[in-house]
Amino acid sequence: MEELKVYYDEDADLNYLKDKKIAIIGFGSQGHAHALNLKESGLNVIVGLYDGSKSWKVAEDYGFEVYEVADAVKQAQVVMILLPDEKQKQIYEASIKDNLDEGDALFFAHGFNIHYNQIVPPKNVDVLMIAPKGPGHIVRRQYTEGGGVPCLYAVHQDYTGKGKEIALAYGKGIGGTKGGVMNTTFKIETETDLFGEQAVLCGGICALINAGYDTLREAGYSAENAYFECFHEMKMIVDLMYEGGMAKMRYSISDTAEYGDYVVGNRLINDNVRAEMKKVLTEIQDGTFAKNWLLENQTGRPAFNARRRIEADREIEKVGKRLRGMMSWINENPSNE
């Protein structure tokens, strides 16, 4: 991999995409953002969906021509797959693989299926990645406000010899070069992304919040107190870290809180936890996690669905819903309730 570099607007040229038709496969959170941003950057964009998709009319209402996936791929010279990881292989095999032409660019926003060999593209196409480091609605909002979400780009297969230029042009088209586009590889992006999700951002933080809440409840404290101290205030602390690192957070809290941070943090995240984190990373690197997740999907997701029901039924979720209902400034999405 080349030395880490950040690319901005002046480093990318939309002309690499000007004469190409871009097919966005999927019109969910990332799909709608990519399609709209590319279109408003002056590029020729169509949308590919399966017949009967609920997103079909939504995409049409935004002014896009919508086709079944195979027909969209046949027309396009650039194909971006923005489908859930677990669905990509099936749709690729059924509708994408045989409709790619020599010299096409096949894009991904996450390296899972390439890195774990679920999808093996033909040798005569470019295989590229643009991975925005933010959810689709933020990618869209930043673009409309004249900014952009930073992205990672990778070139897995460079048949045309222009893979880097095409990837950077795509990144510019969705606004990424406003925030900066950094180089990576499919391997690095996949392994670090999965580790971050599992050990820190999703698995780690949810388990930490639940453990703190349960500890206070078991000690006889009210559900409301436990929720506010272990869950509600999390956003305020994370916002400070997001804005100025841990230093700004520690500057902003009381000295008592800062002292508690120093003397207790490493008691919780101790050597045993760090050793377990290394095991988690190893399972990502050696493919164990991917194998288990793919098998879970092949068998109808029994453990996944059971755990989803259990977690949704936790007391902390019910208390949180009630308390958030008292906070008029929180715009809660009813579909998540």
From Swiss-Prot:
The active site is at residue 110. GO terms for molecular function: ketol-acid reductoisomerase activity; magnesium ion binding; NADP binding. Its EC number is 1.1.1.86. Binds 2 magnesium ions per subunit. Keywords: Amino-acid biosynthesis, Branched-chain amino acid biosynthesis, Magnesium, Metal-binding, NADP, Oxidoreductase. GO terms for cellular component: cytosol. It is an enzyme of class 1 (oxidoreductase). PROSITE patterns: KARI_C, KARI_N. Mg(2+) 2 binds at residues 193, 229, 233. Substrate binds at residue 254. It catalyses: (2R)-2,3-dihydroxy-3-methylbutanoate + NADP(+) = (2S)-2-acetolactate + NADPH + H(+); (2R,3R)-2,3-dihydroxy-3-methylpentanoate + NADP(+) = (S)-2-ethyl-2-hydroxy-3-oxobutanoate + NADPH + H(+). One of its GO terms (biological process) is L-valine biosynthetic process. Residues 185-330 form the KARI C-terminal knotted domain. Belongs to the ketol-acid reductoisomerase family. HAMAP family: IlvC. Involved in the biosynthesis of branched-chain amino acids (BCAA). Catalyzes an alkyl-migration followed by a ketol-acid reduction of (S)-2-acetolactate (S2AL) to yield (R)-2,3-dihydroxy-isovalerate. In the isomerase reaction, S2AL is rearranged via a Mg-dependent methyl migration to produce 3-hydroxy-3-methyl-2-ketobutyrate (HMKB). In the reductase reaction, this 2-ketoacid undergoes a metal-dependent reduction by NADPH to yield (R)-2,3-dihydroxy-isovalerate. This is Ketol-acid reductoisomerase (NADP(+)). It comes from Clostridium acetobutylicum (strain ATCC 824 / DSM 792 / JCM 1419 / IAM 19013 / LMG 5710 / NBRC 13948 / NRRL B-527 / VKM B-1787 / 2291 / W).
